[in-house]
Design a protein with these regions (language model features):
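PLP-dependent aminotransferase-like
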Residues: 92-148
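Phosphate-binding glycine-rich loop
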Residues: 56-97, 115
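Conserved PLP-binding catalytic core of the aspartate aminotransferase-like
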Residues: 265-266, 278-310
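Short, conserved charged micro-motifs
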Residues: 43, 299-306, 336-339
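PLP-dependent aminotransferase class I/II
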Residues: 200-278, 285
């Protein structure tokens, strides 16, 4: 597939910043090239040297874990950096548009607004699936990006895979962004495995959820190598700090924690759902393929405030279209989930 028409001409022609670590990649020698402090950092660990701008050690690990090649991986300061760079790479304000399918992750809209890009919204159906016909009717020659979040946030469900395939095969003027932030909690295979067949796909994932590394802010984009080269071309030169790279490398070297965490969260998700089903104030618990559930409650706003007073924090989604009177609940450890059930039971029995 020819990506050239999807990318803004000045991005193709851009001469990127060349950092000191781009020009010399060796680890041994006397380094007088980057204006670093030769005395160290004054800390136990030495952070005075700039980090690898392409994070190759981490990418080698991820290539094995994700069954892809190193040149198909981009690492960003959270997935939000990848979202922003993709928009700036493809969309010109006043010319191009993107398609969003609310309710969905809010940063797509925020990033588009910051970049002054037209947003066309095609709401999910009542069962939180894609309105394929509506999306296809909304696409025009200036549509550059279609954002799909699966499993979806804030609803928790995975999108029908057949619908995603239909859109990927029908959308000819831009990229389909598939946000898989919660894929580790789903039995659905990642679309990373489809990159060779569908080079117009960009898949996003994160280490913030299943890997428990939210504080480090490391997001991943997986795409055709030519797209990864462009993302690396326009990113800040050292967008992933050295401390983050070291910690992530250690975490990825011990995959058992992630696997055990996922199994525990899935088990607790099932247990919490069964407990909530017994409470009269619960109207509906929506299907979840994530580490959270969306629950439709009677008097959801009052319940949310009651939980806040008890210092149990959930996310009130009642103001979001199609999520009226609903609260998003992250799956906690067993004691936290038991406390939640106890408080909700007390609220509706009072």
């Amino acid at each position: 597939m020819n990506f050239e028409s999807f990318i803004l001409p000045h991005i193709w022609n851009l001469k990127p910043y060349s950092s000191a670590r781009d020009e010399f990649k060796g680890k041994e020698g006397v380094f007088l090239d980057a204006n670093e402090n030769p005395l160290g950092s004054g800390l136990e660990d030495h952070w005075n040297r700039y980090p690898d701008p392409l994070q190759l050690k981490i990418k080698e690990q991820l290539a094995t874990i994700k069954f892809c090649n190193i040149d198909q991986i981009f690492l960003g300061n959270g997935s939000d950096e990848a979202i922003d760079l993709i928009m700036r790479m493809t969309c010109q304000s006043g010319v191009h548009n993107i398609i969003l399918c609310p309710p969905t992750y809010g940063m797509y809209e925020v990033s588009a607004s910051i970049n002054h890009i037209e947003q066309r919204k095609v709401s999910l159906t009542k069962d939180y699936q894609l309105d394929v016909d509506g999306i296809l009717q909304t696409i025009d020659d200036n549509t550059r990006l279609l954002f799909l979040c699966s499993p979806n946030n804030p609803t928790g469900n995975k999108l029908n895979r057949s619908d995603i395939y239909t859109l990927v095969e029908s959308f000819k003027t831009g990229f389909v962004i598939i946000d898989e932030a919660y894929i580790d909690f789903s039995d659905e295979p990642s679309f990373i495995l489809e990159l060779a067949k569908y080079p117009q796909i960009i898949v996003m994932q994160t280490l913030s959820k299943a890997y428990g590394l939210a504080s480090l802010r490391l997001g991943m984009a997986f795409a055709h190598p030519s797209i990864i080269r462009l993302l690396n071309k326009i990113k800040p030169p050292y967008n992933i700090g050295g401390a983050t790279q070291e910690i992530v490398y250690k975490a990825l070297s011990h995959p058992s924690f992630k696997e055990e965490s996922v199994q525990l969260i899935l088990s607790e998700r099932t247990r919490l759902i069964e407990s909530l089903k017994k409470i009269n104030g619960v109207i509906q618990i929506y299907p979840s393929d994530a580490n959270f559930i969306l629950v439709h409650f009677k008097r959801a706003n009052d319940l949310f405030n009651y939980l806040i007073e008890a210092k149990l924090i959930t996310r009130n989604r009642s103001s979001v279209a199609l999520c009226e009177d609903s609260i998003r609940i992250t799956i906690g450890i067993s004691q936290e989930n038991d406390k939640l059930v106890e408080l909700i039971t007390h609220f509706y029995s009072a």
